[in-house]
C-alpha cells in the first residue's frame, strides 16, 4: 500500500521530509472539510450554495451552446468538485449531467441522486450514456455532461497512459471519445478554494491542436497536475 507520505514524496522528492509532512497534514485537513461540506450540501438551499460556490466564465458555456450542441466537461477530483453539481442553478435551459458508476448500496445510491437533484444536478449511469445522449439529441435538448478523468480505469486498448505526479498511470478517455463521436465541444472545469467553505468554479475552453487521439485529455491532465 502507498501511504500519504509516499504519495506526497513522488512529485516533490526535492522537498524535505518536514515540508512533505506539512503538505500531507494540510491535505488531510482539507479532505475532512470536503467530506463535511458534502454532508452539509444535503440541507443547503440554493441561496446558500450559490453564496459559497461561484460559477465563473459562464459566457464560455453560452458561446459554445450557440452551436446547438451539448458540451462535455472534463474534471478531476480536486478541491470541492462535489459542489460543481450546482452549476445548473446558474444556467438557463441547460441540464448538468454527471456520468458515474452506480453504487450497489441502494440507500446511498438513492441519497446521492436526491442530493444532486436538490441542486439541479443529475447523475447518469455510464452504462446508459449513449442511449441517453441519442434520446436527448432527438429531442434537441442541450446538456453539459461531466466526466471525471482521474479515476483508475482497467487497462484496455482504449486506455490512455501518461505520467502524472511522476507515476505512469491510466486515465479515462471516455469524455473525449464521446465528444468526438457526437461533435460536442470540450471544456475543462476547475474548482478553487477561496477560503474555508467558499470556492470558485472556473471553466476553460479548449481546441484540438494536433492529430493525437487524446489531445484534449492530455491538455486537461496537464492542467490538473
What are the roles of these predicted feature ranges?
Residues 1-8, 219-225:
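Single conserved hydrophobic/aromatic residue that forms the stacking wall/gate
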Residues 4, 12-14, 93:
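Residue-level recognition of short, structured coil/turn motifs
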Residues 9-11, 116:
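Hydrophobic alpha-helix position signal
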Residues 11-67:
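N-terminal signal-anchor transmembrane helix
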Residues 37, 82, 219, 223:
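Acidic-residue sensor for enzyme active/binding pockets
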Amino acid at each position: 500500500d502507498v501511504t500519504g507520505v509516499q504519495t506526497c514524496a513522488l512529485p516533490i522528492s526535492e522537498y524535505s521530509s518536514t515540508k512533505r509532512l506539512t503538505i500531507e497534514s494540510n491535505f488531510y485537513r482539507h479532505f475532512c472539510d470536503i467530506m463535511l461540506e458534502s454532508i452539509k450540501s444535503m440541507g443547503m438551499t440554493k441561496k446558500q450554495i450559490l453564496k459559497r460556490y461561484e460559477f465563473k466564465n459562464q459566457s464560455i458555456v453560452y458561446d459554445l451552446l450557440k452551436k446547438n450542441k451539448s458540451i462535455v466537461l472534463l474534471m478531476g477530483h480536486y478541491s470541492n468538485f462535489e459542489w460543481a453539481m450546482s452549476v445548473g442553478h446558474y444556467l438557463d435551459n441547460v441540464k448538468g449531467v454527471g456520468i458515474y458508476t452506480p453504487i450497489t448500496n441502494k440507500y446511498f445510491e438513492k441519497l446521492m441522486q436526491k442530493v444532486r437533484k436538490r441542486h439541479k444536478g443529475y447523475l447518469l449511469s455510464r452504462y446508459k450514456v449513449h442511449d441517453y445522449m441519442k434520446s436527448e439529441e432527438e429531442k434537441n435538448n442541450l446538456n453539459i455532461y461531466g466526466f471525471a478523468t482521474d479515476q483508475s480505469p482497467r487497462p484496455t486498448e482504449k486506455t490512455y497512459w501518461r505520467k502524472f505526479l511522476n507515476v505512469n498511470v491510466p486515465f479515462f478517455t471516455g469524455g473525449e471519445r464521446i465528444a468526438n463521436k457526437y461533435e460536442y465541444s470540450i471544456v475543462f472545469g476547475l474548482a478553487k478554494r477561496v477560503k474555508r467553505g467558499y470556492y470558485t468554479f472556473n471553466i476553460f475552453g479548449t481546441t484540438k491542436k494536433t492529430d493525437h487521439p487524446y489531445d484534449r485529455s492530455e491538455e486537461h491532465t496537464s492542467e490538473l497536475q
